[in-house]
Amino acid sequence: MQIARTLIASVVAGLMATSAMAMTDAEHKAAKEKISADYKAAKTTCDALKANAKDICMKEAKGAEDVAKAELEAQYKPSDKATNKARMARADADYAVAKEKCDDLTGNAKDVCVKDAKAAHTTAKENAKVAKAAAKPADSAAEKGAQVAEARKDATAEKNEANYKAAKERCDAMSGDAKSKCVDDAKRMYGQS
């Protein structure tokens, strides 16, 4: 599992080291081959594991590959769309791994884990949308500020809803007045009605 993180770090470091220069077709092809080789090596490492640990390792390896490919494309053909795609790939990879880690749990603990993973995924996706709005050109500073403010407002609403669902799931472990108070506190904390 640590290998996937090391893989991501080395690929990102390699990509950042050459990010100031334009990437040639040969460099792009070599980087793609390295990503593929790193993924195969990570998969081989995962094959030694058993049960859910193997599943988690495979999700980490696949996520690392997807993120590295998206970041490579963002570097090879820089654009706001490619950068956003890389952010989304990172969010999706983290979500897949977090969800897979929940499989070791049972009952309410598993439900809470899945809701927490979903909340983290929603947060990452909404942050990517805000960054996309901030990078989008506008006719004036006021217009750009309004676009970013609207994106932040929408993102906050989505994040609060996801966090509320996770908090509410935690409350399901309780009963009676304690559960009612817990749900009311969660509603108040995340602005839900």
Listing of model-derived features with the role each one plays in the protein:
Residues L7-I8:
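Short helix-onset patch at the extreme N-terminus, typifying the N->h transition
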Residues I3-A4, G14, T18-S193:
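Mitochondrial intermembrane space
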